[in-house]
Amino acid sequence: MRTRSTISTPNGITWYYEQEGTGPDVVLVPDGLGECQMFDSSVSQIAAQGFRVTTFDMPGMSRSAKAPPETYTEVTAQKLASYVISVLDALDIKHATVWGCSSGASTVVALLLGYPDRIRNAMCHELPTKLLDHLSNTAVLEDEEISKILANVMLNDVSGGSEAWQAMGDEVHARLHKNYPVWARGYPRTIPPSAPVKDLEALRGKPLDWTVGAATPTESFFDNIVTATKAGVNIGLLPGMHFPYVSHPDVFAKYVVETTQKHL
């Protein structure tokens, strides 16, 4: 049975969270769009294999919209890691496996490096290290124009499966419509420079598994492959592109379970 509720943390964030199962903790950190419904099917599949799975909407996004502006502006990996630790504290999650894609990937690596006593292992997918002007420049547009542009980008360029993306439903897409401007103004200019992957020695030997999308153009995240290889971090592929938990939830859940089991 899944718990769906809210909880507040001392930093002023009221988090919407979901939790299912019993066993070792697995935490699924959303990408920059902040919407945990993307993990809906995978949560149950992972929990069924003997884990307690927790996920949440990110500060300022979707059902965690009640949050101080500083938690969703000039966002960095390190800030996000501190916010995630605050909700783990509130939920009494002391030691967890963490997954994250995009800004979530930066977050889980920052958690692994900054809070090693709290993290069993981390899985990161398509971690952004480069400024992309065509995304950063949307910040100056009106909200509606930002949402229109980014909805098209997500569906047609990076979803990895347009049918699965659309199938998330009207309520999810209505929340994403509101999240796109928050992301455009708070994430693209500050997340890539904060990527916690510059110190290769700091990554070496850490319980970290790295993936990119099998259908993502190689040049998009080639730097991920190079960095992981140089640091001796396991690098692999997941089907689809930027959102494997939406396009291929069964394969994603299996990957999370099997990777976590290696570290128990």
Swiss-Prot record:
Q: How does activity depend on pH?
A: Optimum pH is 9.5.
Cystine pairs annotated here are none
Phenotype for residue 126 to A: Abolishes the catalytic activity
One Pfam entry for this protein is: Abhydrolase_1
User: Consequence of mutating residue 134 to A?
Assistant: Retains about 70% catalytic activity
Q: Which reaction does it catalyse?
A: zearalenone + H2O = hydrolyzed zearalenone + H(+)
Q: What is this protein called?
A: Zearalenone hydrolase
Q: Which organism is it from?
A: Bionectria ochroleuca (Gliocladium roseum)
Q: What's the encoding gene here?
A: zhd101
